[in-house]
């Protein structure tokens, strides 16, 4: 065990916390220092120049990463009639209406993404205390409340990620797995940065992308030079 600890410390020592790395080098370091026995997630942490106390500066949205996340998501859809059939055809894992709501109330939460048609929100709204704390509440801002549930299901299955600034104006988002090639991680990160740039609040002043760093689940954070992300 001591030898493992020494090996991990040696790998993490390769990361200079005060250095800003070119994106390709940063991601290569993340891959190299991902030492867990499982395929670690690679996450981006992006500090935005916003005032998180102001509701008009909340940055929130969703995008389909070019290379996905490396995780197959289970999708639940609250819909009925033709929309329910479309959701099933698109690959939804669980589809229902009042019956699904009752299952969720009873503790059934065997899904990673919840999608709802607008008319289903009268039912889903009552599940806020169950779905909300788990980040599963459908929301039109991220495309999970929509009449086009088939597209929403396909996006979720294709590797869609949701992003939202926290109280400190920071976005945390998975951009892949340690097993991904560097180029795939780079393209996923660039897509996330592009989406954040497009979502910049009009009232945000000064430097918007203040700091970008990447890390694996168990690894050290690596600062990224965002000038070569475009």
Curated annotation (Swiss-Prot):
InterPro entries: Ribosom_uL1_bac-type, Ribosomal_uL1, Ribosomal_uL1-like, Ribosomal_uL1/biogenesis, Ribosomal_uL1_3-a/b-sand, Ribosomal_uL1_CS. GO terms for cellular component: cytosolic large ribosomal subunit. Keywords: Repressor, Ribonucleoprotein, Ribosomal protein, RNA-binding, rRNA-binding, Translation regulation, tRNA-binding. It comes from the Bacteria. One of its GO terms (molecular function) is structural constituent of ribosome. GO terms for biological process: regulation of translation; translation. Belongs to the universal ribosomal protein uL1 family. Part of the 50S ribosomal subunit. Binds directly to 23S rRNA. The L1 stalk is quite mobile in the ribosome, and is involved in E site tRNA release. This is Large ribosomal subunit protein uL1. It comes from Methylobacillus flagellatus (strain ATCC 51484 / DSM 6875 / VKM B-1610 / KT). The lineage of its organism: Bacteria, Pseudomonadati, Pseudomonadota, Betaproteobacteria, Nitrosomonadales. The gene is rplA.
